Every structure is written in C-alpha cells, then in structure tokens.
C-alpha cells in the first residue's frame, strides 16, 4: 500500500508513504540472520549453529533491522512507486515512520519527480541538411595532408634562417625577475615553430634566427596561466638554438601513392579512393548533423511543466556523465587519481565542466521519452534478446553475463530511444 502526497509549495516534489508487509519484513530478517549467524558466538553453540529464536532472544530482532531494511527496501520502494504512478528522479530521502516488532513497517520518502512534458510538433519537421558534395579542392587538401604526413625533417646548414613551420632543437632557461622557476628549463627540446606549444610570443621570436645562435626571448605569461604564481608576469628565456630542421615533402607520384596506401598502384587511384572516403565521411557527418538538428527542433518545440528542470535531475545527469567519462579513462589504463593528478583538475572542476549542457541533455531525454510514450513504442522480448547478443559480441562477453548485468527495463529504454530517434528523423524533410 502506498500514498503519494504532492508538495503544496513545490513543483515536482512530494511525499510517498508506503508499507513493507510483515511477510516481507520476516523474509528480510531471515536473510539478514543467515548472513550473520556465522559471526555470532553463544556459549553452548558452535559458530553457525545458533537458532534464530535464540539469536533474537539474546540480541533482539532489532539488531538486524538495518540489514533487513537494506534487503527488502529496493523492491518495496519500486512497487510503491509503480502503484503511485510517479516517476522519481535522483535519490529519495527515506525515513521510517513505524518499525514495531511483529508488525509491518511504514516508511516515507521525500521524492523529486520528473516534470510533465507538453509535446509540440515532432514529426515531419523541416531542418537544414549539410552539403555532402566533394570537390577537387577537398581531395587536393586531403592529399596534401597525406603528403605532409610523409614529410621528412632535414637538418639545415647554419646559414639557413628559421621560418614558421620549421623545427628547432633548443636549450632554454626561463626566469622571472631573475629567479628561475619550475618547468622553465630544458635541454635538446624539439619545438615546431608555429605549433602554439609554448606561451604566446615565444615561438615567433625564434623565427629569423639560425642554428648556433643565442637568443633572448621576452614574453608575458597569460593572466589565466595554470601556474598562478606566474600568471600575468613577464619572463626572460635564454635560448640556445642547436639545430634547425625543415620539412621536405615527397613528390606526388605513384611511388608516394603506394607508400601511403598499399592497396593502390597509382596516384590517380589514391585520389579516387580518397574522394570516395571523403564522400562517405561527409555523408556520415551530414546524417549525424541532420539527426541532431531534428532532435533539437523537436525538443525546442516541447515545453517543460514549470519551465524548469529539477535540480535533482541536473545533479543525477552530471554524476552520470562524470562516472562515464572516468570509466572510459579507466578502460584506457588511466585511473581516477591519475587523471586528477595529470590534469590538475579537482572532482569539483570536472562536475562544473559537465554542468554546462546538463539541462539540455535532461530535457532532450524527457522529450524523447514522452514521444516514445505518445507513439506507443514498446520493444519486444525478441528485440531485447537481439540487443543482448549484440552487446555480448561488441564487448566479447557471454550473453548471460550481459543479461545479468543489465535490466530488461534499461535495455528496452535504450532500444526505444533509438527507435524514436529513427522515427522522427525518417519523417523529417531537408530544406
């Protein structure tokens, strides 16, 4: 039994009072007892052999209330939510109302609910489509990029003056007001002029100089420089240029083509293959941009009850984005601690970074879910099985592992979201 009472003074807030039946309580107490009986020592009984009745007479059933609650609460809360017909977001604040011995338990939850969505037009929308044509200039630019990738850095004579795009091998020693600072010194450092690798003004002052020269470089650290003790300060770098290297590009001929792509024999074949790849890439990018534009227009056409996304939904989205981001880094071998050490960011910084756009992400999800409901999209059991098999193949896992780690409701949600995006995109027209 559950009772939902909306808050009188706050939208999307309310109190859900619900009951955990005595049978559920007994089930939770039994499971909690089985987990703990091996830890209990009572004279006259071997460990693990104490009866539940004796345990309760000595310690009271209240000793297991918290663990029993942890066991039965999730299912009881989910059932109460379903009965009340609400859609909670974020973590509810749940407190006991009564937990009397031998009786059912009554609890209340302070709940934030998802706001109602009023849909606007979402089918047959008109949005701009990107041009997918590939010009000769596009192909030439890509061939030039491939040519640059095959370039060799060739050591120049001492009489040759450095130009933008050259690479210099330097020693440098930086100081502020005569004091040297951490990170301001290096030997045999390779610097590509014009790369923007150093603070503004540094690389430009090496242009026109030759190998063997000593150069004084004067710069001002940016006001927002990451090292606060250097931000906005003038610095002097004493630079020694050891070597000057310049790119030498390979000839654009059949040999170059074969070096770049072993599947072609001539430069003409390479250009033809490049044109096809550029066309495929443009087509994919245009399709993605068109889909994004359709979703954005459908979301803009919809309105949120109260015109505001609840803070709990924003916080939940940010936490999810942060966890996903750090999880992806973890898969690449970069731990949470390592990331914060390398980046110089704090967890709070990362949360602020993901706060930008959170309201849009949440509204987009709410609108798409509302369209799913309006269109009666309900993925079948066969689609869920297919999704599990696809995920198992993608992540090289057993299908049963995937099934046990992901709920049917989550899988159905993902399938439905893809279906609704396809539906509104397929109905849209390019203008």
Curated annotation (Swiss-Prot):
Keyword Cell membrane assigned: no
Membrane-crossing segments per the record: none
Domain PPIase FKBP-type residues, every copy: 165-250
Places the protein is found: Cytoplasm
Cellular component, GO annotation: cytoplasm
Any Pfam family the entry gives: Trigger_N
Descriptive protein name: Trigger factor
Lineage of producing organism: Bacteria, Bacillati, Bacillota, Bacilli, Lactobacillales
Recorded name of the encoding gene: tig
